Amino acid sequence: MRLLPEWLLLLFGPWLLRKVISGQIVESGRPQYLDLRPAMAGGGARGQQLPVPASSEGLNPVRSWSWAWPANHTGALARPGAAGGPPVPRTKRKPSIKAARAKKIFGWGDFYFRVHTLKFSLLVTGKIVDHVNGTFSVYFRHNSSSLGNLSVSIVPPSKRVEFGGVWLPGPAPHPLQSTLALEGVLPGLGPPLGMAGQGLGGNLGGALAGPLGGALGVPGAKESRAFNCHVEYEKTNRARKHRPCLYDPSQVCFTEHTQSQAAWLCAKPFKVICIFVSFLSFDYKLVQKVCPDYNFQSEHPYFG
């Protein structure tokens, strides 16, 4: 029985030691730091306890050490928009059908033709813009340096491309005039465009009577009523430029430079329209029809 305390000490000694050590750790609550530097004059003694260092953020002291597993915050972090969680991802908005269809069908130079010789140069460019609301606009630009008559018009696909019958009978055409005309009304129906081409010197529409004289052939009655267009804007500028004559460089000749712009607003419904261009000068004839694909948006131009 005298050996009982020794046996109890051997049995419960390690357990008591662990309890004492754990009690010290719990009592301290955080690690202690000792100042091993030499004591300074008027300072504290060696072995003085230093203050607890602050955290890296400089706000709060370092939290007490714990062997317990940290709380599971993955659920809170996984929720978009939660505190400390990832930002809410933005959903990509699909462009509306109206905004997507508002893109222009053609651009400047998407259909054009160019003629360049020693005697003259001719360039016609155009574009078609769909306004989605059932209307579309047709725009033209024209530059020429020749004494001749140019006509650009909207025609149905059935329009024949030929030299014969292009110029209607009427007053003698002025060689220096050019026009951007709309073809789509019979002569007896009157001008459909509602305005006179003051800068062009004649009425647009019908037979284009006036100083211009010449015009394109007029389609049939059914085709003529299929077009519903009117002129929104038109302008023509002319200038003379002097240059040495080709036949005699010692003499000075002049060339007539013409710049024309026109915009037509047309209403549907019709699926295909064509652009008819005719140019007539003293020594050159040109007739061309371009029918852009209205339902195909292409980045490549239509060359004439």
Curated annotation (Swiss-Prot):
One of its GO terms (cellular component) is extracellular region. Pfam families: Neurexophilin. This is Neurexophilin-4. Belongs to the neurexophilin family. Residues 85-163 are annotated as: III. Brain and kidney. Residues 164-220 are annotated as: IV (linker domain). Keywords: Glycoprotein, Secreted, Signal. It is found in: Secreted. InterPro entries: Nxph (IPR010450), NXPH/NXPE (IPR026845). Coiled coil: none annotated. GO terms for molecular function: signaling receptor binding. Residues 221-304 are annotated as: V (Cys-rich). May be proteolytically processed in neuron-like cells. PANTHER family: NEUREXOPHILIN, NEUREXOPHILIN-4. Residues 24-84 are annotated as: II. The keyword Glycoprotein applies. Glycans are attached at residues 72, 133, 143, 149. The gene is Nxph4. Residues 1-23 form the signal peptide. GO terms for biological process: modulation of chemical synaptic transmission. May be signaling molecules that resemble neuropeptides and that act by binding to alpha-neurexins and possibly other receptors.
